[in-house]
């Protein structure tokens, strides 16, 4: 890694012939600190090279049959559980509202997280998917970017645990728009949809390391000497020198100042910002209630 070579040279240390796989304690420490620095920078700011758009689709619900017994959480005699998943929400005769699959026991049996209220054989039921995978390299979602592109409105979230219990337990909690939360590393929606919808959101990726020949992040840590990263060289070098001196319990006051300045400069210059007026004037609205005539429909 050129980063380790450059920092070693500036600190008056011996420059290693290779970094990945080295058994030299100093080289191992510099690599470990560089890995930590990169991960810290990912969490520190929404760097434009780490912002990604994710577009995905919900899945069609699975309609099937099974045997249920009052007071039991087990459903038997399901023709096939192949397309079912833990967390799927069930609807049908005798089912508790928002009950979901707790375990898939066999090719014909599942266990729910709530008992049914009636006994029926070969009763119809529907399983809808509420948990969806987050994209590879996902670190965190960017606020207010989650949209339903099918119905053309913003999804509501993220919801807290308190909000979620209200949605599932409140008397009136259902609305026309989807609610969501990040739950157990999944994207969970309410209510679980039974047909295909197109959803989208933007997120910050934790893939800050670029593989050889690539200018985009494809992994979350250095794994080869030819790897580079999405962050500017001056920022990485200033940060690694500061991290190294701090780890060695040496004076790092000057290096901390250099790193702080580099971080501030690069944040400010990462994306363009609009000019700010000292005397802003609101723009006129071209379309409003005054654009609609009082009567005489249809207009000619």
Regions inferred by a protein language model and the residue ranges of each:
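Glycine-enriched, solvent-exposed interface loops adjoining structured elements
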Residues: 1-73, 82-103, 107-300
């Amino acid at each position: 890694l050129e980063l380790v070579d450059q920092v070693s040279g500036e600190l008056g240390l011996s420059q290693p012939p290779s970094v990945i796989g080295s058994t030299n304690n100093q080289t191992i420490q510099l690599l470990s600190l560089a890995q930590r620095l990169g991960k810290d920078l990912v969490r520190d700011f929404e760097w434009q090279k780490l912002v990604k758009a994710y577009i995905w689709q919900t899945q069609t619900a699975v309609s099937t049959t099974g045997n249920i017994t009052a007071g039991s959480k087990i459903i038997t005699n399901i023709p096939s559980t192949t397309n079912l998943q833990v967390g799927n929400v069930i609807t049908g005769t005798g089912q508790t509202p928002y009950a979901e699959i707790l375990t898939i026991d066999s090719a014909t049996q599942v266990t729910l997280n709530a008992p049914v209220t009636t006994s029926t054989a070969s009763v119809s039921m529907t399983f809808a998917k509420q948990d969806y995978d987050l994209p590879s390299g996902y670190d965190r979602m960017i606020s207010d970017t989650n949209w339903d592109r099918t119905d053309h409105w913003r999804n509501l979230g993220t919801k807290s645990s308190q909000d979620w219990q209200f949605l599932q337990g409140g008397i009136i909690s259902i609305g026309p728009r989807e609610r969501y939360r990040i739950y157990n590393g999944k994207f969970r929606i309410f209510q679980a949809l039974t047909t295909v919808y197109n959803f989208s959101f933007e997120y910050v990726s934790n893939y800050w390391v670029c593989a050889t020949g690539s200018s985009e992040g494809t992994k979350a840590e250095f794994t080869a000497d030819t790897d580079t990263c999405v962050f500017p060289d001056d920022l990485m070098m200033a940060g690694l020198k500061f991290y190294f001196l701090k780890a060695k319990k040496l004076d790092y006051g000057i290096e901390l100042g250099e790193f702080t300045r580099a971080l501030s400069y690069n944040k400010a210059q990462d994306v363009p910002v609009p000019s700010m007026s000292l005397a802003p004037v609101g723009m006129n609205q071209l379309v409003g209630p005054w654009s609609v005539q009082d009567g005489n429909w249809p207009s000619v």
